[in-house]
Amino acid sequence: MNAVNELPLGQHNIEIQRNREAWSRKPMLRKIYYDFYRLLAVRLDPHLSGPVVELGSGMGRIKDVIPQCVTTDLFSNPWLDRQENCYQLSLGDNSVSHLILFDVWHHLRYPGTALREFHRVLQPGGRLILFEPAASWVARLVYHFFHHEPVAVRDPITWEAPAGFSAADADYYAAQGSATRLFWWGEGHDRLPGWKIHEVRPITSFDYFASGGFSGPQLGGRFLHGLMRGLDFLAAPFPRLFAARLLVVLEKEKS
């Protein structure tokens, strides 16, 4: 399935509202996401000063685990701290210790253009933490048949925005395989001047599959949740087959 590119930008906010409703009625999903947020929390470098900023916060629930995190989105929803656009941030140069993008990278039509802006605002040694879908063999099947956003592992990735592009031109876009291709499979390793790859970690999460995410039905309850954790342990040595999620940490190089 090809990358989504024909929907208006407001589709993102429609999905945020739907996700808030799903969050309120799916306890298994909440538990899984809090575990994911804790994975991000332990990757914050305590030696860095400056704000921790999440871009594309959506529901803003990361504050439940990282309370000091500044939550932002394209849309000025009242539960968020501020409005930001990844292509043109209002943050100062070298002012931020960490940027967190949770399920946001694959919505960037021009990731190289956004990455240059992230590099501008991060202080030297600052971290860009991405949490994304993993395009393992099993995950591709699950996301293809049970999620509305395409994986798009064969579509071209347009790294830089065309001449004349402005942040106001940002539109709805989705290609879930983008981070996998660029960081796990290595297609983007030669496109990272000024960055150091600190970590690329595929994560098995059968309980995430079983939860149905935000858009699908939840399968089972607490018992199934425990069973899925057991499957995660068994499948962990085979990430290219079974990984559901991908954690990427980039560091801005120190001059």
Please name every model-derived segment.
Residues 1-87:
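Conserved N-terminal segment of class I S-adenosyl-L-methionine
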Residues 97-110:
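A short SAM/SAH-binding and catalytic strip from SAM-dependent methyltransferases
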Residues 190, 194-255:
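A C-terminal cap/extension of S-adenosyl-L-methionine-dependent methyltransferases
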